[in-house]
Amino acid sequence: LKELGINAVELMPSYEFFEWTSLTEPAYVYPAPAEEKRVNYWGYGTKALYFAPKASYAASADAVAEFAEMVDALHENGIECLMEFCFAPGTPSGFALQVLHHWQLRYQIDGFHLVGDASLAEEASKDALLRKTKLIFLGFDGARIYQGKRPWFRNLGEHNQGYQYHIRRFLKGDEGSLSDFTYYLRRSPETH
């Protein structure tokens, strides 16, 4: 990774999540028979054991030590480690902040990509422990968070799905993608 010039890695949900979920859980949009189950390969939308690294991703029985060694190896090579968290609907924000504190303090995670409830963005951005931690959200109100003032430390980032979609079209060479690409390229608010 270092030889490729990569300076950060974002891990999709790497905490212990339940792989077998019912199709009636909120993660699934379409209703289905209650007895039908699906494998949740990615860790999105279900309740999880947020404080533990995913044991099935580890090569040994000690997933905790292995995860810590991985983060240390990334840091030794000048690569930051960010984690994506998808908290289940209804997860209290205080609990979510405790989870982020745990991963930052125990594993020295450099940042978090938080998927789901946008209200967590404001609380996380004001949290004393996370003040210098990279925080990435899908849609947050920078003006409300910063209250019209310039941020003292620019740690908030927006995961912009529109940009992601249009940059992919542009890179593939899709016809008519240039104007959309330039629009999203220029749209970079001062707040983040």
What are these regions (language model features)?
Residues 1-15, 37, 106:
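Catalytic domains of carbohydrate-active enzymes, especially glycoside hydrolases
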Residues 108, 125-192:
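Conserved alpha/beta catalytic core and glycan-binding cleft of carbohydrate-active enzymes
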Residues 15-17, 56, 85-89, 118, ...:
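Active-site-proximal loop/turn and secondary-structure-junction residues that shape catalytic pockets
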Residues 9-11, 81-83, 112-114, 135-138:
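Hydrophobic faces of well-ordered beta-strands that scaffold small-molecule active sites
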Residues 64, 118-124:
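Active-site-adjacent beta->alpha loops and helix N-cap segments on the catalytic face
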Residues 2, 68-77, 124-130:
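Surface-exposed amphipathic alpha-helices with a cationic face
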Residues 21-76, 89-107:
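Aromatic- and acidic-residue-enriched carbohydrate-binding clefts of CAZyme catalytic domains
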Residues 17-22, 91, 120, 143-147:
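Short catalytic/ligand-binding loop motif for oxyanion handling, primarily in non-cytosolic enzymes
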